[in-house]
């Protein structure tokens, strides 16, 4: 039955097997006189269809077709003309000279035929460019305020698209747009509001005013109100001191007569970052009302929102539990899944088993996407109730055995891995499930990840030898990628369990006969290491892996090969290191847990490429580390400056990203002058910005050499120096050639120890600690007055030193009065730095003391690092 | 209309559809001329420089014209030739008061007259020496000499003095064009 239906469908689609060449051939019919409108319509549909299907048409072919299409303007057939507009829009991107239909479209857009006008406007805006836009500006203004809503809407929507390439011109239409906002038509009002917001989006004050104004005189269109709520929410989130009237407006929308607006307002309130329970309550009540709606879409939206905020406001959501319970048996499985996962998040520990049973009943019926939602819920549940892993693990294992897509399996494997890492009790059971999974796994990526995990975790279990069978099976059965990963996993067993080493060597010897180069190479290398190398080397090369940034390594090797002097060996220490080992996959944040907003550490690579392009800094070598972006000005200042510190082996380059927010000024010769009050630091080369027009971001650079005195920290005064040329705000043309000098004081630039240290985690800290010896060991004990508990202290010390914690020692069990954290990293120049910091709370007065030991393979480095803490 | 027009076209008496291309340098009056040819109620009040091209429809006694009004600016002149192929006549409009650009005009006119789609198909060309009302404008015969058209025997061309603002001379030119096109289409049929 099903296949029959499919056959009919494919038979019904006349466009199914179109050939590009033949369609373009047919398009010649456009040149015939007189024009056969029906035939041309059909050919145009074919042409548009193949473009929509992603068929790429060459520029010459497209242009030829386009010129053919232009000839169809002579026909008066309405449907053909409308097809022509569509075709013009599609061909606009791929064809040359599309501008030649401008006059034809302008004629249609100003003509009397309403059927043409809206479509002509859309096509016209698609083909026009900034220069041409000014000639049709007058018509656009008229169209925006046209009485016909379809025309007005299409003009406004086209303007929204135009905002992207020629915002300056569109900005001039603000008056007309404002008029359109007061239109009676729902769509026009909505579109006009959206455009008005985009016109003012850069000016926070104007946006605030806009919200104030429209929240008072009620908008008719529910769409527009929804949009206004979104703008208002953005205002509340962005502002430091939000206006209370804005919030009052959103809250008043909870009593709007349109369901859509009520939901939007509720969603906005619950998603606000800082809200009190009393503010949240009405919104949750509104969502609860939505839950009882007869419309499935509304119920779904409400449950989905509740699910999202369940972690942030568990108490508030708990009041809806009764309604959610009803949904467990909802015929719509998506709603049921979301309801159950919400209950899992908010419910008590005792109800978990019952809910899991419920969900197990229909888990096979829901789509993979929702299964992933379930898996994520289980993951957050496990971190909340670690003891429940006995219920969860078998459930996950069962899900793992059933069929599913790659994403779904990946989510399960990630969840199991997360549980294993967080909860030592679950380790043995979890590893067993994963072993069973890789016995029959069709996704190479997941197999390799599991093997990597086995290599890391399994040797530390009470009975490591039991896992070897599973791993060696992979060597025999699987694809190249998996075999290679299995060999590495085996070697890790050999490195960590000395008593298993002889048997591992036997297995590795068998791998030497593998059919693939990579597998043989790995086996040979590991075998050699395990039989001959010292314990320290085994640790370094088998367990830790290569912790360098791939692009940095590539650049360094290229430089080495270019230099042509092979007398000195390639020094791996000059290669910039990364915090993540090459093989470590990125961790995925579970979607349903509130995502933390943290400043992302910039990747070294994009900056490295920027710096390498500047000849003054080419001699400095590869970048060792780039800091995060640090603001040196208030975000609302006239000129904003962000600083990024790039550390090289012997110098630092400070990159100042300057932005000019004054639309009537053009800044020339912008540079940042640094001054050290102690006279230790001196600036070397500087690169200034020649021209900084309004709204653009450019970078100035200053070079700082590390002083001979050995200091690696300090703070420097910074002054932004530039010349100002007054310009006309609208055109950007200078008023005159006169310039005047100006300075602008920035916040102080701090250089810290952490700029010279890149955190690199060691997988086995103990052996690395032993291997360093005692030559360069420094110890220090002191009181910490600024922090109040142990976790804060641990975080602080790793921040100050720039080192990262190893072996999960940064997790402090609750209720302990003493904790030792292991930190490791690399000092610029490639020196290892290890540190053991013991933090203790004095039970009498709750003061915190810290004892820190720093070890390095270079005494000077240890001195420098310890100086940072003292 | 319906029945009689279809009946008359059956006997070959109805108006035939023809395509013509209207070209010429910028500001020579192409759009104004076409505007003048339309019925008074469909005329537009304002003439702005054409970008690309516009299709204008008008009719004479026996023919119904689809005129491709091409833009005259330098950057659009390369698009003219795409339309010769599908048309049955060319109107070349020139500004007879513009003595400065006579050489450029000559080049562009030769480009049109010697274009392969024009020469090989032998389609008629009507040259309109527009703006004859301006004092000091060159006469049609002066222009013929200045452009070297008197040496040009091949092809079917004719020149007329016109004034687009008042419509003087246009009727005569259009009659000539209609006659030429009818002749051309009959020669094609046989």
From Swiss-Prot, chain A:
Pfam families: Adaptin_N, Coatomer_g_Cpla, COP-gamma_platf. Keywords: Cytoplasm, Cytoplasmic vesicle, ER-Golgi transport, Golgi apparatus, Membrane, Protein transport, Repeat, Transport. Signal peptide: none annotated. InterPro entries: ARM-like (IPR011989), ARM-type_fold (IPR016024), Clathrin/coatomer_adapt-like_N (IPR002553), Clathrin_app_Ig-like_sf (IPR013041), Coatomer/calthrin_app_sub_C (IPR009028), Coatomer_g_Cpla (IPR032154), Coatomer_gsu (IPR017106), Coatomer_gsu_app_Ig-like_dom (IPR013040). HEAT repeats lie at residues 60-97, 99-133, 168-205, 278-315, 316-350, 389-425. One of its GO terms (cellular component) is Golgi membrane. Its main location: cytoplasm. Gene3D superfamilies: Coatomer, gamma subunit, appendage domain (2.60.40.1480), Leucine-rich Repeat Variant (1.25.10.10), TATA-Binding Protein (3.30.310.10). Transmembrane segments: none annotated. It is found in: Cytoplasm; Golgi apparatus membrane; Cytoplasmic vesicle, COPI-coated vesicle membrane. One of its GO terms (molecular function) is structural molecule activity. One of its GO terms (biological process) is endoplasmic reticulum to Golgi vesicle-mediated transport. It is a peripheral membrane protein. It comes from the Eukaryota. The keyword Transport applies. Oligomeric complex that consists of at least the alpha, beta, beta', gamma, delta, epsilon and zeta subunits. The coatomer is a cytosolic protein complex that binds to dilysine motifs and reversibly associates with Golgi non-clathrin-coated vesicles, which further mediate biosynthetic protein transport from the ER, via the Golgi up to the trans Golgi network. Coatomer complex is required for budding from Golgi membranes, and is essential for the retrograde Golgi-to-ER transport of dilysine-tagged proteins. Belongs to the COPG family. This is Probable coatomer subunit gamma. It comes from Caenorhabditis elegans. The lineage of its organism: Eukaryota, Metazoa, Ecdysozoa, Nematoda, Chromadorea. The gene is copg-1.
UniProtKB/Swiss-Prot annotation, chain B:
One of its GO terms (molecular function) is GTPase activity. It is found in: Cytoplasm. It holds the Pfam family Arf. Its main location: cytoplasm. InterPro entries: Arl6, P-loop_NTPase, Small_GTP-bd, Small_GTPase_ARF, Small_GTPase_ARF/SAR. Specifically expressed in ciliated cells. The keyword Transport does not apply. GO terms for cellular component: axoneme; cytoplasm; cytosol; dendrite. A lipid is attached at residue 2 (N-myristoyl glycine). Keywords: Cytoplasm, GTP-binding, Lipoprotein, Myristate, Nucleotide-binding. One of its GO terms (biological process) is PERK-mediated unfolded protein response. GTP binds at residues 24-31, 69-73, 130-133. Belongs to the small GTPase superfamily. Arf family. This is ADP-ribosylation factor-like protein 6. The lineage of its organism: Eukaryota, Metazoa, Ecdysozoa, Nematoda, Chromadorea. The gene is arl-6.
